[in-house]
Each structure stands twice: as C-alpha cells, then as structure tokens.
C-alpha cells in the first residue's frame, strides 16, 4: 500500500468525521438543555407563587346546592386545608380515604373546590366515597384553579387564619406528607397565636 493510498483513506475518514461532528455537537447541546427542562417539568418541583401571600379572591357557586359554599372571607379565622379535586381524577380517589380521616379527626377545617367537573358526577362521587368537606364550591371553568396556581388535581393548600397560603401539595396527600409536613406546620401556626 502506498503512502498516497494511506493518505486518501485518512482523508476520507477525516471528511466523514468532520461531516458527523456538527450533528454530534448539535444533539449534545439539545440533550444538555432538554434534560434539566424535563426534570423541572414535574409540577411537584415547581414553587407556588402564593406561599405566604393572601389567598386569591374566591367566590364560586356551590356544587348545585349540594352543600354550603364558601368565599375567600370564609378562609379567615382558622387554619384550613383547601383541596382541589374532580370525580374523573384517579389520584383524587387515591387520597380520598385520607381526606375522610382528616375530616373525622376534626384536626383541621377541610374545604373542597371541585375542578372542571359535572356537578352530578361530583355529587355521585362524594355520595359513593363519602364527603370529607365542611364546605364545597364548584370551579366549573377552572378559572379559580388558575388563580391559585393549580397545575392539576389533586392539589391541596394550607391556608393560615389570616388567609395566607402557607403550604401547597401537588398530587395525592399521603400519611407521610400529613404527618411530616402538614400537621407540624399547622401546629407551628397554632403556637404563634
């Protein structure tokens, strides 16, 4: 094999490498920027702009006269959990037994906001599984959920006695979240009185 043949082979390999290199760099840059975006797209990781701020103005209709409704003024005076839920929401069903336990324990006031649901479907769901809510309203168009910063149901907010949002939980509530985060925060808020 002559030096010319070796040089030609080497030149072909270099041309191929130079042709492929921009594509490798391009995909490397895409991956570099896409991975953090995908990791941050988990709503549980997104902070709530409402923490330590007053609850948004809330004045919604009742769930078709199912139960007494509430507005933002009703969130004053006592710590309250506000739970956004829907009858069509699978994770809402998962957390429902825990909401029933919270309601039975009377450890904290629990209000519900039914999100983008048919009133009759929501009433049937509550009749079937039990109704943990002291008061409940219907957010038929989802506007109030947007004001609260809801990414999807279920979401639960802890509101202090002054009407400020103190904690937000995305997804179904669990015993662990209740025992390790929510109730200690409720206790701390009560001790500040």
Q: Which residues does each PLM region occupy?
A:
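Structural microenvironment flanking redox-active thiols in thiol-disulfide oxidoreductases
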Residues: 93-130, 140-146
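Hydrophobic beta-strand anchors of alpha/beta hydrolase catalytic cores
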Residues: 81-82, 110
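N-terminal targeting signals for export/organelle localization
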Residues: 1-61
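Short gly/ser/thr-rich secondary-structure transition/capping motifs
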Residues: 40-41, 61-67, 136-139
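Aromatic-flanked redox-active Cys/Sec active sites in thiol-based oxidoreductases
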Residues: 83-88, 115
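Thiol/disulfide oxidoreductase modules built on the thioredoxin-like
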Residues: 127-132, 139-190
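A short beta-strand-turn-helix
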Residues: 58-81
């Amino acid at each position: 094999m002559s030096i010319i043949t070796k040089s030609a082979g080497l030149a072909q390999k270099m041309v191929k490498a130079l042709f492929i290199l921009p594509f490798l760099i391009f995909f490397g840059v895409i991956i570099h920027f896409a991975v953090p975006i995908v990791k941050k797209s988990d709503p549980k990781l997104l902070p709530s702009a409402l923490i330590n701020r007053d609850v948004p103005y809330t004045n919604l209709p009742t769930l078709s006269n199912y139960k007494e409704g509430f507005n933002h003024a009703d969130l004053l005076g006592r710590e309250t959990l506000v739970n956004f839920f829907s009858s069509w929401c699978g994770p809402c069903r998962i957390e429902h037994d825990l909401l029933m336990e919270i309601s039975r324990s009377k450890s904290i006031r629990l209000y519900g906001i039914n999100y983008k649901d048919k009133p009759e479907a929501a009433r049937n769901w509550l009749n079937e599984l039990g109704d943990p809510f002291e008061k409940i309203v219907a957010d038929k168009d989802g506007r109030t959920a947007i004001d609260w910063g809801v990414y999807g149901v279920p979401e639960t907010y802890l509101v202090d006695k002054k009407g400020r949002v103190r904690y937000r939980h995305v997804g179904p509530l669990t015993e662990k979240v209740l025992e390790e985060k929510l109730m200690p925060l409720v206790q701390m808020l009560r001790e500040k009185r």
